[in-house]
């Protein structure tokens, strides 16, 4: 019914630690560039535009090396500090070339290719087709012998009970409407397990792009394979849904892992060097003298123009602004592609007379779109290999051993992050609320589509229009909620509560159908098909606000410097929660033999997060997060010292403490817990 939640980058607002005021410095762009050496990197899997510039880069490296020979030891030390401020590490095969427009286009193209699967397939035509295929193999519930009719066939009295169907799957009798719900639960479970297992490969080694393309091809071809699904092999449709949904989720995790790298190496960031206190103490006089010498340079040579060095706070602001700009553009491009494909899908369904064949043709088109427009992404997106695992000796063996090493490391990192999160009460409150809320969001979408198909007898083209309306309203909501919150003076958690109140209207509206006087009216309470359209607009508008503000609120609670690990936990909570809602709704449908009672469950699921959000104290969460960050930073300082000594920190460093956001042992964790509780 609605597209995937837009994943705007976090914009946490924190009070900066008191620092000694920094004095703006001027420096020559040429002098700054001479200190940067861009390592030549080659791979059989790299983008086509990477080798074309190798000669010019080699020449640049040569010039850079000669300039580096004349730089002072303090300048080299400052360069290392600079690189750490960007979040980067020095390691073998690091690709530090500036982000190109072609590389950005490749990143956008994958969103353009794959977002259509969310909007047109998994949120619309796949659940419709799965229910239709199950119905073709089912029998009427009333006698368990008569074959079922199409769910959108109108009965003379307009009743719903006579058209309820059941189908036998693996020896179990289930309602045809719950068949799709159980399928989605299985797919989300596998997706959550896979996302955790590959998260390490997304950040380490040279597997990021290879895995992204592998999952893209698997997902797109599994969607195209729906053209071969027929009544006799309807279970194949469920298997393809599981494969495609799991592949899509994994590919988008890998795509999102490119975003920090694109931002970090963007020219706007590369040439915005942070100022440090040490630089001012030891280099201010020399730097100003060098900068002043360029005032006499040719006034027509822009390359020698002077530029103010940014403070660390300013550099962070630039990075967040650029990250938001790139991510928002990718979301917008994906939404536009999804709406365009959905309009074509409606035309196909109209042309082919609302048959299951028309739905299979639509899915063939969606899969082909995903596959074809992944090709430019494969050509233009650079591999950008990450640092090796701290246990590098294990991962370097390759093959199955490397896979096991990466998977075990990923699960260890997850458990370590959870051990940190449970010590922060406001993080726990938020993740509990987000677990319930994200489950309600996903379950409401699939339940509403199936209710409209089986209870309201809406035809496939009308069901597709529900998705179009919801997506359009979601785009409007993403931009409107910021204005609404400013206008009403709402804080982020208050805006989330306002969204929850509006969201609660959807299941409550469905429950109105139980009221006797509403039943007598024959309208309202989801008794007429047209009522789905305004509800779809409300759903999309609410989703546009929740997606952004939940990430923003969570960002304010994260310990400074641990954003990546905690946002991974945020994503896993989002994926993992969606296992339960569809399964419970499926059980309700099987027990009651209709879908409307599921609105009771949805009303509870939507309302439960509200008190948890209400009791979140952002100020308290910031203080506790900063105290925890101080302990984490102690281990990171040890890692930096190991790096300066020319060795990569490993799990064996520091008395066996493994890396954990930085790593900590049990004694550190107990000390932190006492600090937080003793505030």
Swiss-Prot record:
Residue ranges, compositional bias (Pro residues): 1-21
Glycosylation sites: 354
GO cellular component: vacuolar membrane
InterPro entries: Atg22 (IPR044738), Atg22-like (IPR024671), ATG22/LtaA_families (IPR050495), MFS_trans_sf (IPR036259)
Membrane topology designation: Multi-pass membrane protein
GO biological-process terms attached to the record: amino acid transmembrane export from vacuole; autophagy
Region span, Disordered: 1-98, 638-679
Protein name in UniProt: Autophagy-related protein 22
Species in which this protein is naturally found: Pyricularia oryzae (strain 70-15 / ATCC MYA-4617 / FGSC 8958)
